[in-house]
Design a protein with these regions (language model features):
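Acidic/histidine-enriched alpha-helical segments
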Residues: 112-135
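Histidine-acidic residue clusters that define the catalytic metal-binding segment
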Residues: 2-10, 150-191
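A common structural junction motif
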Residues: 106-117, 206-210
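M16 family metallopeptidases and their MPP-like homologs
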Residues: 18-20, 25-51, 60-111, 143-168, ...
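Hydrophobic side chains in well-ordered alpha-helices
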Residues: 101-102, 181, 202-206
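N- or domain-start disorder-to-order transition segments that initiate the globular core
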Residues: 1-28
Length: 210
């Protein structure tokens, strides 16, 4: 098991950073996630945000750029953990890629929307994709039955809420509202960063962004 080392100041920071020794591995892994309370009114926005940020204006751009620059795997996803919803950014690169390069790529993906915004075209495209994913889940009878059972047994709690969002909530989400939600998330959400590789103090500079 890989031991994790916390690197924390004396006060409780909004951005917490953990290092894991990874010299024996062939790649470096950088994971950043926003830790959000799982609520019905924001669950679908968060799930859609992951779709929009992953694809952006160019459906193959970010992933292709990461592959060309770093021989890397890049992804954004949403994970449900108990009563929390995690918006997760992950970048896995070859060992010869500098930590500063990884951070520059991550920052570009994180903060470019604050300058460029989201277009209605992109948001509508990703809404269709997310809606199809959610409808496909309903077609999986066993998975749908498990989800319905959880909704009933955990009724009235965050555990009953789907971390994948709800198709019926997509219609009311537009580009402007989604950008406002993302801006608030960047300014207020708890952030955790995990890095598996050779320890580099450059990672601590992420705290300046949150």
């Amino acid at each position: 098991m890989v031991a994790m080392e916390k690197c924390e100041p004396k006060y409780e920071p909004r951005c917490r950073i953990f290092f894991a020794e990874g010299q024996k591995f062939r790649t470096n892994l950088l994971v950043l996630f926003f830790d959000l309370p799982l609520k019905r009114e924001t669950a679908t926005k968060t799930a859609l945000l992951a779709e929009v940020l992953r694809q952006g204006e160019d459906p193959t751009g970010a992933a292709r750029q990461a592959e060309l620059l770093f021989g890397a795997h890049w992804d954004i996803s949403v994970v449900k953990k108990g009563g929390r919803q995690l918006l997760l950014f992950s970048l896995e690169t070859l060992k010869n890629v500098e930590t500063e390069e990884m951070l520059a790529f991550l920052r570009e993906r994180l903060f470019a929307p604050m300058q460029n915004g989201f277009t209605e075209k992109t948001v509508e495209r990703q809404k269709k994709i997310l809606r199809q994913k959610l409808e496909n889940q309903r077609d999986d009878k066993k998975a749908f039955a498990r989800r319905r059972a959880l909704e009933e047994t955990a009724k009235g709690t965050a555990l009953a809420i789907s971390g994948d969002g709800y198709a019926e909530d997509l219609e009311e989400i537009g580009a402007e509202g989604l950008l406002a939600f993302y801006r608030e998330l960047l300014e207020t959400a708890r952030v955790q960063v995990f890095f598996c590789g050779e320890k580099d103090e450059a990672l601590l500079s992420l705290r300046q962004n949150f």
